[in-house]
């Protein structure tokens, strides 16, 4: 199975990816563009050195480079379970994604969150972690919105795009994702792991009383 998480900054993609791995799919490989580029930039290859120079200078990494790095990693994993977080971010990347995972069991999850909820989360996170996320939030969201509809349109031509209302509490979103992925047999396992790993008894409730933080 290959899972793709798409959503705006602050929608909880990173949080949900980690929950899915920790509680349901322990062999899941979570791939993010930023981590893959960082890994590639330190391998000493010609491409890796080019990426390092651009990252050090704050330059934009071309789509072709991002696609190449992702494909290289995916090929190395063979038939392992994969979750791609935050990719694609352009129409070109969307078309490449379909080619990379051709004939794979591809599950695309689109996180939908209101701007108000996103802003609330970003402000809360910046206060808790002394980060200035709110200062760049509008810019990141604007960039995301410019390409999002085209990306969804491209992906939906050949695959089902599953929309998840991510305005809810963390546990409620996790439950919906598990069901939509067809992992119903994992629900009890997920509940047990949620209870054991994350919350005392009074906090276990689907859709309520979650204290975990959202990450993009």
Q: PLM features: residue spans?
A:
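Glycine-rich phosphate-binding loop of ATP-dependent small-molecule kinases
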Residues: 1-216
């Amino acid at each position: 199975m290959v899972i793709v998480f798409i959503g705006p900054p602050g929608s909880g993609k990173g949080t949900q990816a980690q929950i899915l791995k920790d509680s349901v799919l322990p062999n899941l490989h979570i791939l993010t563009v930023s981590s893959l580029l960082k890994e590639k930039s330190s391998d000493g290859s010609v491409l890796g050195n080019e990426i390092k120079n651009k990252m050090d200078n704050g330059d934009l990494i071309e789509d072709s480079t991002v696609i190449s790095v992702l494909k290289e990693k995916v090929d190395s994993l063979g038939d392992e379970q994969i979750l791609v977080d935050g990719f694609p971010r352009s129409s070109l990347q969307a078309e490449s994604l379909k080619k990379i995972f051709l004939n794979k069991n591809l599950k695309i999850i689109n996180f939908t969150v209101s701007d108000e909820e996103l802003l609330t989360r970003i402000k809360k996170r910046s206060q808790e972690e002394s980060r200035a996320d709110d200062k760049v939030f509008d810019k990141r969201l604007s960039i995301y919105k410019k390409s999002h509809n085209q990306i969804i349109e491209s992906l939906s031509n050949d695959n089902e795009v599953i929309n998840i209302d991510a305005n809810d509490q963390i546990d409620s979103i996790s439950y919906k994702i598990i069901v939509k992925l067809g992992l119903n047999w994992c629900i009890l396992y997920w509940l047990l792991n949620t209870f054991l790993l994350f919350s005392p008894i009074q906090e276990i409730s689907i859709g309520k009383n979650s204290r975990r933080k959202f990450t993009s």
